[in-house]
Amino acid sequence: MPGKLRVHELAKQLGVTSKELLATLKDQGEFVKTASSTIEPPVVKKMKKHYESLGVTTEAPAASQEPKAKKPAAPKPAAPKPAATPQQAAKPAAPKPAAPKPAAEKKPAPKPAAKPVPKPGFSAAKAESSAPKPAAPKPAAPKPAAQSSTTATPGSMPRPQAKPAPKPGGRAPRVANNPFSSGPRPAPRPGGGNRSGNAPRPGGGPRPGGNRPQGGQGGPAERAPRPGGRGGQPRPQGGSRSQQSGGQERQGGGRRPSPAMMPTHPNPGQMPSRSNGSRNGRGGAGGQGGRPGFGGGRPGGGGSAGGRGGRRGGTAGAFGRPGGAPRKGRKSKRQKRNEYEAMQAPNVIGGVRLPDGGGATIRLARGASLSDFAEKINADAAALVQALFNLGEMVTATASVNEETLQLLGEEMNYKVEVVSPEDEDRELLESFDLQFGEDEGTEEDLAKRPPVVTVMGHVDHGKTRLLDTIRKTNVGSDEAGGITQGIGAYQVTVNIDDLSRKITFLDTPGHEAFTAMRARGAKSTDIAVLVVAADDGVMPQTVEAINHAKAADVPIVVAVNKIDKPGASPDKIRGQLTEYGLVPEEYGGDTMFVDISAKQNINIDGLLEAVLLTADASLDLRANPDMDAQGVAIEAHLDRGRGPVATVIVQRGTLRVGDSVVAGDAYGRVRRMVDEYGNDVEEAGPSRPVQMQGLNGVPGAGDNLLVVEDDRVARQIANQRNARKRNALAAKTRKRVSLEDLDSVLKETSTLNLILKGDNAGSVEALEDALLKIEVDDEVQLNIIDRGVGAVTQTNVSLAAASDAVIIAFNVRAEGKATEEANAEGVDIRYYTVIYRALEEVEQALKGMLKPIYEEREIGRAEIRAIFKASAVGLIAGCMVESGKVRRNASIRLLRDGTVVADNAKIESLRREKDDATEVAAGYECGMVLSYPDIQVGDIIEVFEQVEVPRT
């Protein structure tokens, strides 16, 4: 079975770069890290279809045929056929020392030398097979000049070729520069030298083909050779080395190269050029018959005349610095002026040059980092970090940044930054998987009627819970006898109107906080809102808040005036009060239905249900497609000890079946079991049907969307991306902005209260966290929620609390197993609560207790100095009369003289009444005091005060 394709392999087949394919995969919602990551076959098929739609054809067949096309260009067995032994090669080399003289006088000889090299299939084997054709006594003919350089006697070949001839049009092979290499020596290039017979030039005269057609250093015909025997002079050791290497004799020249002369790495001047003219005349005095370690055509003794191009001076090859990169020089005035103008550009912040957006709009997700911003604008993340630092913000490249900071940085670069809302972010995520939430599929004929979904809201103690209990007891089946599953947050009741059986789905939400969270996520989970108002209490603040929530969600309202049986109840007063908030009763000419009920006495409950159905029929189009994949909302979720994560969901459209792959918020899984409000197993649930679902890998949040997807892989990818985005948004929200101005205050010691929240369901944990974060305290203390979860307190929670010095808040849950023992051993404080308001009060008191105390000054007494006595042991003694209050020993005093403060915060070191020491002296008595401030006079007033701690509020 073939293995999975990797990203770079698929990119090669599609004919795109790996970077482009990685970007496309990320846009399509596929999580791949690098180009070596494997891809699932469905994703491969998806990518091929995507690129075929863009007009890109795959290149898989061409890639498979590419190795076969290279084989004819490498005829390896062709080299050994004309090869000769070194003994045979040395014999015909001797009688041709003066062959190049007539050829050297012909200057047009280099021109035809450029023709034979680019021919396809031209190799050293063909050159050797044609060796007998050009005769040695006829070197003056210009016609075979190109062949004479390559068709010399067989002795001109150093040894049989080990490498194939270069491909036509391809780059010439790299020439080795290690003279001590023991490996096979490279064969000389065809057409590498233009001297007939590869014989050395006597006296270093001008050589044919030595001048490059591309300029550079001229040959000896243009200037005299350099002193020292390097300018094309033959080596004296050339004759002795010809027998060993199979090349021609060297006549004179420079000294033998040593390892000290070798460069540590190949230079650009040693690299073979692409043009044929640059290949001609590569050899110096040694020519092709030079030392095999230097390669064919490498300059022997010198070769500076044609060995390299570029600047004058220096030697080529392995003996000096070739004409490579230019030396670093001074900047021109134009370069300096351009750099100065670039530094003065408007998009340069603190010396950091940033791109100019030109007013373009950049969309970023919540909690985006500077790396994400830099990727959007093709900039360097380090430059953004430095620019933000110059603006006074200390942020790393990968840290989540809040919306204000991103917009500030965008304004500096002339970009308009838009942070995507949670709704748009989730919609774009689903669109990347070709999914949509909130719309019915199919035509009008596919839509069917569904029951209305009703949420009951109202002020505390107005009878909302009693109304729900009354409705449930009224519609419980006779076989159940009131045995309703109280933990479920939604249920259906049946109402008979005009001999028709109608169903209504009620949501038992834990208050308006959860209702707000659901509306904020854009889930149309509620069709009608029932507003419960007590007739004897009137409109309260939470009643007004519930009205505002319902209006913001564009939900019709039915008002239930409760407790009409109590004395002092005034339903008409309630109608008048609600008129101020836009709820005008129908009897007053409005469109809001008011129903007077008594939930305790079960009065007119059926009338309320009938009003709900009439409002639904008149104001709403309650239809859905039951045949599509199910979509809904998670009303509540909790962690059960035996069943695992259990979510109470309500299906809005489609049909949810056992075995479907679902994703709810950042949780995903496969539906293993569904039960209704009576605890009965359900195989499928249609629109507006509430069920309890098992099979998720985690506990979703209250109000999270439920979606049926194609398979578990898609569900996992959607959940992981949602989880990552939630973490980034939370990190950006909780990160405290540190600027250079408040750096000193940040570095000061601050008190932080770390909390770990555990609750019985996701809704209570969410409500508790939101309420705790809204507690307003001084900046000296901070509240940090380091972890939150659903279920009992575990040992993991205790270990985390012990490591981070945190307090565990357990809401309607207890510690399980050995968690209590470990908490006692580690000294971890676990607080248990059943009422959310009690938890909020105690946490607020704990935060206030962590505040630094505030002291205020309170005056205790007042005394006047009447006389001054001198004592050698203690100094001056003030004889005083206490005018008001009390004077205490060791108390703080303030000395006044003529209404001016002379000494502040002095101390009473000694206090005596008559001759006895006294702790305090009351008003109307005389006393003697020794003060810490010695400069006292008669008539001075002494104010005695103390610092009293004031409780923080």
Curated annotation (Swiss-Prot):
Indicate the principal place this protein occupies in or around the cell: cytoplasm
Compositional bias of type Low complexity: which residue ranges?
81-93, 123-133, 143-160, 233-248
Segments passing through the bilayer: none
Q: What are the start and end residues of every segment in region (G1)? A: 458-465
Q: PROSITE patterns, alphabetically?
A: G_TR_2 (PS51722)
In residue numbers, the region (G5) covers: 598-600
Q: Which InterPro entries does the annotation name?
A: EF-G-like_DII, EFTu-like_2, IF2_II, IF2_N, P-loop_NTPase, Small_GTP-bd, T_Tr_GTP-bd_dom, TF_IF2_bacterial-like
Q: Where is composition skewed (Gly residues) in this entry?
A: 202-219, 280-323
Q: Which family does it belong to?
A: Belongs to the TRAFAC class translation factor GTPase superfamily. Classic translation factor GTPase family. IF-2 subfamily.
> Which purpose does this protein serve, as stated in its record?
One of the essential components for the initiation of protein synthesis. Protects formylmethionyl-tRNA from spontaneous hydrolysis and promotes its binding to the 30S ribosomal subunits. Also involved in the hydrolysis of GTP during the formation of the 70S ribosomal complex.
Q: What is this protein called?
A: Translation initiation factor IF-2
Species source reads Corynebacterium diphtheriae (strain ATCC 700971 / NCTC 13129 / Biotype gravis)
